[in-house]
Amino acid sequence: DILKEDENVGHDFLAGVSKDWEKEAQQAAAKGVRVAVMRFGVVLGKNGGALAKMIPAFKMFVGGSMGSGNQWFPWIHLDDLMAAVRFIIDHQDVSGPLNFCAPNPARYRQLAKTLGEVLGRPSFMPAPAFMIRLAMGEFGDVFLASQRTIPDRLLKHGFSFQYPDIKSAIQAVVAE
């Protein structure tokens, strides 16, 4: 299923935090204040974020996907995230929940394959789910979850992504 802003945010720990946060934010909306709730995908950038943690493994020829690799991975390039925040500030008609993720979600195996291609390295060593959970505890489930999320409301309001696909985003991050 494709998750848009009007869908339920889920039932895991992070979903619970998001629901509570959004409920509190809506109190301001009830008083006439414009509220734009930002739901972030995984941010891709050179100086931090998911790729900064993955690139060293790929450079050492031990890169691969997480878990089965079939999970959908909602992501956004840092430049697009910043542009989307500016877009919301400049467009007073935009409010409510907004998915801050690229319009073309990728599966983890596609992310790993593309990162390997861009770096000129193989992508053959997946990190098993049990190792991710062991290393990251409950937060590991966040990386193993599958969310095919799209930024439906940003797109309907006319926002344009500089990096709409995973390959262009990874190429930009590696070139930074």
Identify the residue ranges that each predicted region occupies:
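Catalytic helix-loop patch of NAD(P)-dependent Rossmann-fold dehydrogenases
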Residues: 1-37
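Alpha-helical substrate-binding/gating segment
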Residues: 26, 55-64, 71-105
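Glycine/proline-rich active-site loop of Rossmann-fold NAD(P)-dependent oxidoreductases
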Residues: 18-19, 31-33, 44-53, 88-98
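Mid/C-terminal beta-alpha module of Rossmann-like enzyme folds, strongest
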Residues: 91-138, 171-176
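Glycine-rich "substrate-gating" loop/helix at the edge of Rossmann-like oxidoreductase active sites
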Residues: 8-14, 41-48, 68-78, 89
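C-terminal amphipathic/interface module of NAD(P)-dependent oxidoreductases
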Residues: 141-176
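Alpha-helical membrane-targeting segments
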Residues: 53-75, 117-146
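Non-catalytic, hydrophobic alpha-helical segments
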Residues: 81, 85, 100, 111, ...
